[in-house]
Amino acid sequence: MFKHSLVVLRVALCGALALSGLTAKGAGLTPLEQRWIAGMTPVLQHARTSGMPVDIVVQPQDAPDAAPLALGFKDGRCKFVLSLRGNPEGEATTQRLPAGLEDSALELMAAHELGHCRRYLEGAWFHLPAGFSATPVPEGLSPDLQRAYLSMKSVRREEGYGDLVALGWTAQRHPDQYAALHAWLMQERSRDLLPGSHHDTLTWIKLVRDPKALGSAPSMFDAALPVWQSGLNIDEE
């Protein structure tokens, strides 16, 4: 979700520990893995109650360069992939969780990934709304750089949608904590920011500084969609 955390597509799960249930105790997990899974559990329970096919996958090998949390999609199921072992960013992210709101922040992170899951399941990943016109690729780029540019923009749009879903969850489940968690997400997205890069989602986050901007739709996905579409137009200006 956060820095250096591109979404994992059709992740290779050989040797990984897959958890079909929501309990992490007694599964050979580290305390940090148990902590993250416990924090994400309300979102995972909501997903399963809603009929979304989700699993937790824990990578048992050291993964120093991986995103601590990412989403995989395999055999029609969404995989919440934890890569915390031998990964300094896992501990660093944990240390950056807002004091007193750690569980709610982990829920926000999980809801972000659930937004990706929803887009995969709908077959909408990297797809743009009808009528939306993206700006052309800058001139003078090689074919490889053109593909990289288009991929970067597509990832950023999906990350923006994921952030809006995450904030929609927060607005519905923890309204009294919304301002603090919104500020924390702004801070995370501003760390080492490269404007226009994969995780530059500030265009969308700024649109929902006031949670009322997310409307009153009962679904966090439906709440995110119109704001996401508005942000697409701003992002192209």
Regions found by a protein language model. Give the residues of each.
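Long, well-structured alpha-helical subdomains associated
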Residues: 148-155, 164-237
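N-terminal signal peptide c-region/cleavage motif recognized by signal peptidases
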Residues: 19-21
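Bacterial N-terminal signal peptides that target proteins for export
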Residues: 2-12
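Second-shell loop/turn segments in exported
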Residues: 29-33, 93-105, 147-156
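Zn2+-dependent metallopeptidase catalytic core
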Residues: 32-55
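Active-site scaffold of zinc-dependent metalloenzymes
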Residues: 69-104, 110, 114, 120
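Boundary at the C-terminal end of the N-terminal hydrophobic targeting segment
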Residues: 24-26
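Post-HEXXH active-site segment of zinc metalloproteases
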Residues: 120-159
